[in-house]
Amino acid sequence: MKKKGFQRSDRVAEQVRRDLADLIRTELKDPRVGMISLTAVELTPDYAHAKVFFATLNSEHLEEVERGLKRAAGFLRRELGKRIHIHTLPELHFVYDSSIERGASLSLLIDQANALSDQTPEE
């Protein structure tokens, strides 16, 4: 039987992402975390673990941001449990998402290639 639309785990992962983003923005007081964006959440099938992918505007302080998130993981999990009622609340693992930086560098390379082709005289 073909599954239509989102599976339950996809909906739960998206809800976890939204609630964590709200908790980080409103409840987390750690200045190391600052301006981050949660890009995705991947849950294991048993919901025991969640990879929370994040991006930050200031990648120079990436290690500090990761330490702040790791330190706040227990607090965030506890607060998440107050918002989401599922049998197993996932343990949070924060992972830096470098796809935005990779996309920007690829876009720059494409722009440079286009600029070179515009400068090359046509025969």
From Swiss-Prot:
Which Gene3D superfamilies does the annotation name? 3.30.300.20
UniProt keyword terms in alphabetical order: Cytoplasm, Ribosome biogenesis
Q: Which domain of life is it from?
A: Bacteria
| Entry's Gene Ontology BP terms | maturation of SSU-rRNA
Q: Which GO terms describe its cellular component?
A: cytosol
Compartment annotation: Cytoplasm
Would the keyword Cytoplasm be found if you checked this record's keyword annotation? Answer: yes
Q: Which GO terms describe its molecular function?
A: ribosomal small subunit binding
Which InterPro entries would you find in this protein's record?
KH_dom-like_a/b, RbfA, RbfA_dom_sf
Aminoacyl-tRNA synthetase among the record's keywords? Answer: no
Q: What is its main location?
A: cytoplasm
What family is it from?
A: Belongs to the RbfA family.
Cited HAMAP family? RbfA
What does the annotation say about its assembly with partners? Monomer. Binds 30S ribosomal subunits, but not 50S ribosomal subunits or 70S ribosomes.
Q: What is this protein called?
A: Ribosome-binding factor A
Query: Which organism encodes this protein?
Result: Dechloromonas aromatica (strain RCB)
